[in-house]
Amino acid sequence: MRTWKVNLASAGRCVVKISAMFAALFFLTVGSALAQPAEAGGEAALKLPDLSSVSFLGVNGHSLLMIGLLFCVFGLGFGMFIFMRLKNLPVHRSMREISELIYETCKTYLVTQGKFLMLLWAFIAAIIVLYFGVLRHFEIPRVAIILVFSLVGIAGSYGVAWFGIRVNTFANSRTAFASLPGKPYPVYQIPLEAGMSIGMMLISVELLIMLFILLFVPGDYAGPCFIGFAIGESLGAAALRIAGGIFTKIADIGADLMKIVFKIKEDDARNPGVIADCTGDNAGDSVGPSADGFETYGVTGVALITFILLGVKDPAIQVQLLVWIFVMRIMMLVSSALAYFINEAIAKGRYGNADEMNFETPLTSLVWLTSIVSIIATYIVSYFIIPNLGGDLTQWWKLASIISCGTLAGALIPELVKAFTSVESRHVDEVVTSAKEGGASLGILSGLVAGNFSAYWLGLAMVALMSIAYLFSGMG
């Protein structure tokens, strides 16, 4: 009887909490809606111009972006090719069993997360209907499109995260087996291939969805599609990223407790916490970042589209900028693949039969090679796509220079991070020496100093690059 009352009380508290959350969301939504002018509708009210109204290199914008779909298919094929290659690499039966056990545990985690996401989506869907349907008086089809594409966004984040887990668990056991002969190159090559597979798949899926909206959805309904898609992928990424981080910490602590209680080594096969720890690491370091990367790439695209449509009034210039942005995104995909193949040919020739190698060297060269190829492609594509933007013959190189500042940031950040975290870093040596000579307290203080110092240089680099980009933007 007492148990029944406790359960009833617990259920009652849950209902009260959910009701309170709904009430808070209701009043926040109503308040924000009343505070805005009647014509507001955000991205959902945006209308796309006719992409076929402007020609580029003798081809209208719609047809040019249709060609971009082929590059997306290429990216998907590239990702699947590496996926199958990793799957078919030699692996010891025991190693495969462990990696499959980790994958099955990760799968259970993802299924649970999927159910949780659907519960969250139900709350968000109610707010979407309330805001757009009741307060903004959108037509039922328009609200339905927002809801449908929010599910598409969730499915995108969730699907990429699942693909990432599958690829990584393939790569884990194959890398371990490839390391047995003692050659370092396979230990570098297999994880890098797994990362390229996930990255190419992520970008290709994202581009495919956004190009589908641009090319096949009527302009009046593109806004609801984009805002729904952005809401969905943001929701999926937030849940998978945060929950994955929490899960990995809990699993790691659990594995350590098992190690202490039973006095066994952390990676001992007799410690079942090791599997939980490995699952947690995959959840925190694969599921979360994969979904987060998908969301970041997509939301950035939606923001760029919104900025162009709101900041530019001339439909012809809108079309030029929209086509240019997406052609640039497609070319970045091609540049990444090209740089990867060139870098791998160099790395294999240099380290293929080596007994020792610095793993940071080919990774650093890949980052810089990708950045250089991307910057060159940025200027070339900009020159041919937007040579004359609104009567200005100089805008193409100014916009290309602004994008190149962002590309350069992607190369500089790893260099600055490496200066404070590399095995050959002077700061790492200082932290080790401090901990060795002065104990834990001095080691912690030394680490804090190095961390703050690194944040200073990273921040300074970002401010410098943003200032340079701002100077280009002010040139007219």
Question: Where do the model's predicted regions map?
Answer:
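Hydrophobic packing and interface segments
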Residues: T3, S10-F26, V30-G476
